[in-house]
Swiss-Prot record:
<feature type="topological domain" description="Cytoplasmic">
    <location>
        <begin position="204"/>
        <end position="226"/>
    </location>
</feature>
<keyword id="KW-0812">Transmembrane</keyword>
<feature type="topological domain" description="Extracellular">
    <location>
        <begin position="21"/>
        <end position="182"/>
    </location>
</feature>
<dbReference type="InterPro" id="IPR034446">
    <property type="entry name" value="Fndc10"/>
</dbReference>
<feature type="glycosylation site" description="N-linked (GlcNAc...) asparagine">
    <location>
        <position position="109"/>
    </location>
</feature>
<feature type="transmembrane region" description="Helical">
    <location>
        <begin position="183"/>
        <end position="203"/>
    </location>
</feature>
<feature type="domain" description="Fibronectin type-III">
    <location>
        <begin position="74"/>
        <end position="166"/>
    </location>
</feature>
<keyword id="KW-0325">Glycoprotein</keyword>
<dbReference type="GO" id="GO:0016020">
    <property type="term" value="C:membrane"/>
</dbReference>
<keyword id="KW-0472">Membrane</keyword>
<feature type="signal peptide">
    <location>
        <begin position="1"/>
        <end position="20"/>
    </location>
</feature>
<feature type="glycosylation site" description="N-linked (GlcNAc...) asparagine">
    <location>
        <position position="86"/>
    </location>
</feature>
<dbReference type="Pfam" id="PF17742">
    <property type="entry name" value="Fndc10"/>
</dbReference>
<keyword id="KW-1133">Transmembrane helix</keyword>
<protein>
    <recommendedName>
        <fullName>Fibronectin type III domain-containing protein 10</fullName>
    </recommendedName>
</protein>
<keyword id="KW-0732">Signal</keyword>
Length: 226
């Protein structure tokens, strides 16, 4: 049985379902008793070992939900970046318990690609208890690269050789221009309004056809006699 044209039009103009939030896999959500994260933003130059000690609380209950957030998570990696609409990026990572016991800190390096070379944007030293970091004020339409490297514990006097540091994991992303997002939202709203108007017009035409024109067509014509 074929569906009526009006039902097909309603199905075509129906708004798309809301985008579901990106699920949080086990290990990404911080535990309720997770400690505060100590970190230092390291300056560029010869005094790179300085920096003011700061603290941040873990990002509990965070969900990356479109269109206000875009998730960049390379397959098989323990590092992911959530690019928010306010031009900030939440970087999250996870470690196995055995590997976490061998880490004394994390080194985060940020860079962005220009026309001919890459430019550093931020270097952060994070404590071993840190599992996320918020990078504020990224530029639109610029390819960023964030690399996180676990730093092993310092070898004691009895150790034969220092432990080799693990390789850094990196994630790349580009922040979408906020103006383009507003244009997309506006076009979606206008398209939805046009669909609603078409549905109303179709309903009016169907009502006029069923209730006004059919009785007039069914009424027999009156013939005039001389």
């Amino acid at each position: 049985m074929r569906a009526p044209p009006l039902l097909l039009l309603l199905a075509a103009c129906a708004p798309p379902p809301c985008a579901a939030a990106a699920p949080t896999p086990p290990g990404w959500e911080p535990t309720p008793d997770a400690p505060w994260c100590p970190y230092k933003v390291l300056p560029e130059g010869p005094e790179a070992g300085g920096g003011r000690l700061c603290f941040r609380s873990p990002a509990r209950g965070f969900r990356c939900q479109a269109p206000g957030c875009v998730l960049h998570a390379p397959a098989g990696r323990s590092l992911r970046a959530s690019v928010l609409r306010n031009r900030s990026v939440l970087l999250q990572w996870r470690l196995a318990p055995a590997a976490a016991r061998r880490v004394r800190a994390f080194a985060l390096n940020c860079s962005w690609r220009g026309a001919y070379t890459r430019f550093p944007c931020e270097r952060v030293l994070l404590g071993a208890s840190c599992r996320d970091y918020l990078l504020p004020d990224v530029h639109d339409s610029v390819l960023y690269r964030l690399c996180l490297q676990p730093l092993p514990l310092r070898a004691g006097p009895a150790a034969a050789a220092p432990e080799t540091p693990e390789p850094a994991e990196c994630v790349e992303f580009t922040a979408e221009p906020a103006g383009m997002q507003d244009i997309v939202v506006a076009m979606t709203a206008v398209g939805g309004s046009i669909c609603v108007m078409l549905v109303v017009i179709c309903l009016l035409v169907a009502y006029i056809t069923e209730n006004l024109m059919r009785p007039a067509l069914a009424r027999p014509g009156l013939r005039r006699h001389p």
